[in-house]
Amino acid sequence: MIRKHILSLLILLIYVNFSSISQTVINTESNLNKIDSTFHLFIDGMGDYKKGNLDFFMIKSNLTVGSRVKGKNLLRLTFSNNYQKFNGNAFKNNISGQLRYNYFYNVEKHHSIFSFIQIGKSMRSFIDRRFLVGGGIRKRTTPSKNAGYFDVALGAFYENESYPTYKFQEVEFSPKTYNNLRLTLNIFTRLKFNTHWNLVTVMYSQWKSSRLKNYRIFFDTTLNYIISKRATIFLKFNARVQSEPYIPFISNETDTLIGF
């Protein structure tokens, strides 16, 4: 019986280390180039169910709806969820949704002004609710379409976060809500090495305006090998770093994923 529980725990720990990162940052970059003047819908999902020596259930999905209007207006609606349960106990329940608008004041150079509104929650990060609204300016520094692009975005957003009651070192902490104004510096790159290999990288950095030592960095990079129009092998890595987490036992998170 003890060996059974140890084996179950090891499987859970391995899965957590390689499962998707628990965060309420939404990466809207992956399908950006595929959205033209027509209506586009992108859906992907996965699920897993095991029963026996251990009970495990997981469902994960991502949905993006987007369209360009008159060439200069880009509208995207993104939704994602990740729910996981082990032996009857949920240990991950993340939901995020975002509406983002870009106005391209220079279509040829891909310079745009953007605004967004987002809401989400993260069980693993102890966030009951995270609400964001903000905007900024995004500029492309590389003109080549064939080799890829390197974009830089500057902006700001209002952040409202709610945390539940929790206990730490035998001390019980009451629910708390934080309201911040954060400054952002974001980097978006897509490098095309040849007809088969490309690298897509996104880096979001978020700095509390009244205390720059309080920052969050989200890094996501994917190396793709394109076999055909319908088949791609990828290696994905992402990380989330918080300099001053509001929950003291919340650590930085990383995720590595290989897929087809």
Predicted regions and their residues:
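Outer-membrane beta-barrel transmembrane domain signature
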Residues: A147-T232
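Cleavable N-terminal export/targeting peptides
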Residues: M1-D36
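Outer-membrane beta-barrel "beta-signal"
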Residues: N252-F260
